[in-house]
Amino acid sequence: MCILGNTLDYGPFGFLDRYDPMWICNTSDYNGRYSFHNQPSVGLWNLNALATCFSKLIKKEKIISKLRLYEPALVKEYRALMNQKLGLSDDSTDYKFQDELLKIMQRDKVDYTFFFRQLS
């Protein structure tokens, strides 16, 4: 994760083909810390590490209150992007379809990227 939003490649990585939330793209990650499913928590860990750098400049309570905004913002944006990928309205908040679709994709070993490419 880069504060500038750049993509950094430290390799060896891969891409998510067959949808499997527990898939690990980093071949040196034996415990699944960086699995697809764990990406949000790793993002929060990275933000915590960055916040530590500012701990002498910003009160701890303020840092904590800002870090607590991460998960709700991430979930909201993720759901909105999934709605967009699926051609659903932006204001749709019934996420059962998204969740069921991902379960089916995992069960049937559907190529994640190809599925959404074909859908578009």
Identify the meaning behind each predicted range.
Residues 30-120:
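Regulatory N- and C-terminal appendages and interdomain linkers associated
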